Each structure stands twice: as structure tokens, then as C-alpha cells.
Amino acid sequence: MITTSKTNEQAFEWLIERALVGSTKEEREAAGLTDVDAQQPDAQQYYWGLPKDLDKKWAVDMRRLWSFLETTQKEELEKYTGSDIKTEVTKLLSKEIETFGVIKVLREGFEVNNMKLKLFFPKPSAADSTLSHVKYSQNQFSLTRQQTYSVLKPGEEIDMVLYVNGIPLFTFELKNPWTGQTAKYNGKK
């Protein structure tokens, strides 16, 4: 019996998501696994994200950012003396990324209201301390499908976004020329 392979955009999304997360959104829904906070990915897997967790104004996945910061830097966060830590940190983070770029901010972190926050722990070598290995394992890589992103155009979506600790690193707009989808025809986001 000959079977046809799925070559559409959604099938490609499924393959990518299954490879990174371990399951697809549809598989999780069918199994009743909808609690995003109950995830415990192993060292080879990513968290799965929800489009609603993106703060569209500041372009940050709030769930992953704050989960990472609260898990890895609780003592530093306790130094905060202002009135709204999430707004102040997220606003300054967005400004730092806009000014210095994502890579520099991930490497160096940033300071806000007497706190020095790290946003990524680099992969240690085998000779590095146990603490370095633990910190690296606390990074939260995540993948979100069908990510809405615009305050001005609420229906606009990007096929997939890959985040590290809530900060978007890569966006994927999948196109399949076999089905007539091309960047030239469908436009750029």
C-alpha cells in the first residue's frame, strides 16, 4: 500500500516540535496534558510555550522569563526596592536588547534597581564546577507555535518562535513551495 507523506506547513511544524519538545500540541491536548506549569523537560527537551505568554509590548515570554529568574536568582530579586518588579525588569530588558542586542544581553545580563540579573548560563566544560553544570541545566529553552506578536495587528502570527529563558532567539515562518507558499508570495513578517 502506498501512503502519501504530509508535506504541508503544519506537518513540518509537528516534526520540529516533536524533535525539540518531545510531543506536539495536538498530542498533548489529546492526552489531556494542558498544564504548562507542570512541564519537566529532560536535558534534551524544550519547554512548550503558549502564545498568550508573550508580552507583545516588550517581546518577552513572561512565563519562561520569570520562571527562570525566580528559580535561579531568587536572592537577587529580593533586593528589589521598587513597586512593580515585573514591569520594571521587563521594560529595561527590552530597552537593553534594543540598545545592545540579544547576544550581548544574554552574555552579560543587566542591572536594574540594585539587582544584577543574568539571563543565560553558558554551557560549561567538563572541567568546570558542579555549580556551573547545575546553572546551565536551569536554562529554559522553549518553543511556541503560532505565536501572535503584534499589538497593532492582533491576528498576525509567526509559525514558530524559539526562546531561551523567555527571550526570543529565532522565529520560523515555514513555507512550502510545493503548495504555493513562498516568502515572496506570502510576504515578510
Segments the model singles out, each with a brief description of its role:
Residues M1-K189:
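An alpha-helical interface "stripe"
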